[in-house]
Amino acid sequence: MDLCGFRVGLDRPLFLIAGPCVVESEQLALDTAGALAEMTGELGIPFIYKSSFDKANRSSHESYRGPGLEAGLRVLEQVRRQIGVPVITDVHEDTPLVEVASVVDVLQTPAFLCRQTNFIQNVARQGRPVNIKKGQFLAPWDMRHVVAKAREAGNQQIMVCERGVSFGYNNLVSDMRALAVMRETGAPVVFDATHSVQLPGGQGSASGGQREFVPVLARAAVAAGVAGLFMETHPDPDQALSDGPNAWPLERMRELLETLMELDQVVKGRGFTEQGL
């Protein structure tokens, strides 16, 4: 599949979607995007910058949601112009989709909304590639229906993203078999290595997380075979305004990416023996 000027798939090198969970300030966005663009450029990794202007599904109404549509899009536009990288952001049911699609390169649908048919199709009709996050409540094989809805709206640039599945209360687990199952949709599969270590609502009025397991799950996903990785990162995760407990430190991103790229080359170079069984 063509995506932002590069090809993605199991026959192509790993691509990266990364950035802070939410837009905090223009300077933080530019600094983070610049650092990520520099390291991915040196490593030969296709890169899309991610940040949200509004996090509509925060645990508490008192949690920081973002700067809002106008201010958030202005920051994302500056990232595109000044850093020269494509950008992706979340949209919701009440988002003015045309306005957002005029600024960003890729649209992302939240996991909780993956079953909302009208929403998925409206997003797909905007003429932008779409990254559809699989709900924490959804079986991986059920994503074929979600992809079919999006394609029925006339969009063939659809990706599917695994971000863990609910396991009891306030916990998620990642079943690596899901990555192979989701390939059967024909859409490129992305693994979200940071939300997969989230502990939803685990801090009472906020979600917790176990960022020490980000490299573990990222390595496992790349070994299983994915088109791309999604990782939220922050210069100081403990001070991040959203999802800090599961964000990967920006200063440690390069060393992790180097390992992941080596794994990706080995796995994709040898092929996938499970195919055709």
Curated annotation (Swiss-Prot):
Pfam families: DAHP_synth_1. One of its GO terms (biological process) is keto-3-deoxy-D-manno-octulosonic acid biosynthetic process. It is found in: Cytoplasm. The keyword Transferase applies. One of its GO terms (molecular function) is 3-deoxy-8-phosphooctulonate synthase activity. It is an enzyme of class 2 (transferase). Keywords: Cytoplasm, Lipopolysaccharide biosynthesis, Transferase. Pathway: Carbohydrate biosynthesis; 3-deoxy-D-manno-octulosonate biosynthesis; 3-deoxy-D-manno-octulosonate from D-ribulose 5-phosphate: step 2/3; Bacterial outer membrane biogenesis; lipopolysaccharide biosynthesis. It catalyses: D-arabinose 5-phosphate + phosphoenolpyruvate + H2O = 3-deoxy-alpha-D-manno-2-octulosonate-8-phosphate + phosphate. Its EC number is 2.5.1.55. Gene3D superfamilies: Aldolase class I. One of its GO terms (cellular component) is cytoplasm. Belongs to the KdsA family. HAMAP family: KDO8P_synth. This is 2-dehydro-3-deoxyphosphooctonate aldolase. It comes from Alkalilimnicola ehrlichii (strain ATCC BAA-1101 / DSM 17681 / MLHE-1).
